[in-house]
Amino acid sequence: MRVTDFSFELPESLIAHYPQPERSRCRLLSLEGPTGALTHGTFTDLLDKLNPGDVLVFNNTRVIPARLFGRKASGGKIEVLVERMLDDKRILAHIRASKAPKPGTELLLGDDENIHATMTARHGALFEVEFNDERPVLDILNAIGHMPLPPYIDRPDEDADRELYQTVYSEKPGAVAAPTAGLHFDKPLLAALREKGIEMAFVTLHVGAGTFQPVRVDTIEDHIMHSEYAEVPQEVVDAVLAAKARGNRVIAVGTTSVRSLESAAQAAKSDLIEPFFGDTQIFIYPGYQYKVIDALVTNFHLPESTLIMLVSAFAGYEHTMNAYKAAVEQKYRFFSYGDAMFITYNPQAIFERVGE
C-alpha cells in the first residue's frame, strides 16, 4: 500500500484558521460505512444519530502551552516544542536551532529569556531539558509557553487559543495537540446527550508532536509510528463491555480515543478489552481488524496522514476518499479548527484492496 494512495487535492482556502464562534454549530458530514451513503448536516444532528445506552468515549487530555522561544546562553536563537513532561523538572522536546545544542548547553527560555534550563541528554530526535527553577514544569509552561497550534494554522497563537484549542472536558495536562473531534462538544450539547441517556466515558491519550510529522516512507507498511502515552481505566472497560452486552454501540470521539481503545483491546489477555496504562505505537491502516469501535466522530485529516489511513480502515478506502472528495466540493472546513464527520463501521473494509 502506497502513501500516495491517500492523497487528495485540498484548496488552501478550506483550511480553517479559527474555529466556529459556537463549538457545536460546525457542519457534520455523516458517512454510512457499509453503503458509503453521505448526509450533510450540522454537528448537533449527532443527537439524532445516537441511541440511549450508546457510549461516547472522549479523550480528556489537556493541551499544555508547549512552544517555548529563547536562545542558547552562547547566543543562537532556539524554539522548543515539548513532546512530553518527564517529571516536575524535566521535559523531552524537539529543539529547532541553527546548530543542535550539545549536552550541557545552557538555555535561556521565555519571551524575556529569564528561565534558565540545561540540555542534559539527547534521545534520537528528541532533547532532554532540565529546568533550573523552583517551580514545577507545568507552572513554567503556563507562565512562558505558547499554545502549540498545528503547522497548517498559519498564524501566531493568540490568548483566545488557550481555551478555544481545548475541549470543554479537558482535565489531564500533557498533550501538545488537541484531540480536535472533541472541540465541537459544548456544555449544552453534552447536557442534551446525557438527557437522552447517552453514556460517557473518558480515556486519556497525551497527543504528541509526532501527530504532525509527515509519513516519510513510500510504502505504508514501512512507517514507524510515534509513541504516545495512553490510559484506559477500568471504568471505561466496564462501560464498553456493558454496552456490547446490551447491544449498544461504542462511539469514539476522535482518532486518539480510537487508538486508546484499540490499544487496550490489542493488549487484552482474556477479555475483549482490558485496562491499559502505557505507551502505544498502534498504527491503524486498511487491513486492520477493529475490535471495539462501532462509530466514530472525527475531523477532516491531512492528505497522506496516518489519520486518514485510520479512517479508511474503519469506513473503507473507497468510501473514505469519496467522502473527502464530496467534502472538498461542498467546501467543508478542514483540519483542527474545521468541520466534523460521523462515521459508522464498515465490516467489509478489512477485505478491501487499496492501490491494486
From Swiss-Prot:
Keywords: Cytoplasm, Queuosine biosynthesis, S-adenosyl-L-methionine, Transferase. It is found in: Cytoplasm. GO terms for cellular component: cytoplasm. Pathway: tRNA modification; tRNA-queuosine biosynthesis. The keyword S-adenosyl-L-methionine applies. Transfers and isomerizes the ribose moiety from AdoMet to the 7-aminomethyl group of 7-deazaguanine (preQ1-tRNA) to give epoxyqueuosine (oQ-tRNA). NCBIfam families: PRK00147.1, queA. Belongs to the QueA family. This is S-adenosylmethionine:tRNA ribosyltransferase-isomerase. The gene is queA.
